[in-house]
């Protein structure tokens, strides 16, 4: 069952140099088998991006109205208390993505888009996740994903089929 995004979830933007338009969407769903899926689609009417590498990292959890970093991200000096606008949220996503790549943090799930531009990643529990894609070029386009933060909350898990 496809479920709503929380207020922190936002669409993953995939840009193609030739198309100069946003490609992509992201859907969060939960199944009866306690699996939380993050489905990423990288295509529009004219362009499909296959073999795009994606990873998700659990970076934090909600603590009352704010988020706190957890796990391997807990010691990073990042202010998680002010997500009042998209630019601040994007700055945090960019910073966490840089830390994850620089420090070699192991993602919760990884995958590559198939011939239809689709990939299904798995999350292990409720929390704040970083969705990160790897840049690459093929013969027709340059793929440069923007890291995003999504919250998988208890309501998404509770509403599973």
What spans do the regions from the language model cover?
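Solvent-exposed loop/turn and edge beta-strand elements of beta-rich ligand-binding domains
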Residues: 2-161
């Amino acid at each position: 069952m496809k479920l709503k995004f929380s207020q922190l979830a936002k669409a993953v933007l995939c840009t193609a140099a030739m198309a100069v338009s946003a490609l992509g969407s992201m859907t969060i769903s939960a199944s009866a088998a306690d699996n939380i899926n993050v489905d990423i689609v990288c295509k529009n009417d004219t362009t499909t991006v296959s073999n795009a590498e994606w990873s998700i990292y659990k970076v934090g959890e909600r603590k009352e109205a704010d988020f706190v970093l957890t796990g391997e991200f807990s010691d990073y000096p990042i202010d998680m208390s002010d997500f009042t606008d998209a630019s601040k949220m994007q700055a945090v996503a960019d910073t966490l993505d840089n830390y994850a790549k620089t420090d070699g943090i192991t993602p919760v799930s990884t995958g590559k888009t198939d011939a239809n531009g689709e990939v299904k990643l798995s999350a292990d529990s409720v929390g704040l996740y970083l969705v990160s894609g790897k840049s690459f070029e093929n013969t027709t386009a340059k793929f440069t994903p923007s890291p995003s933060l999504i919250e998988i909350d208890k309501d998404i898990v509770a509403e599973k089929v």
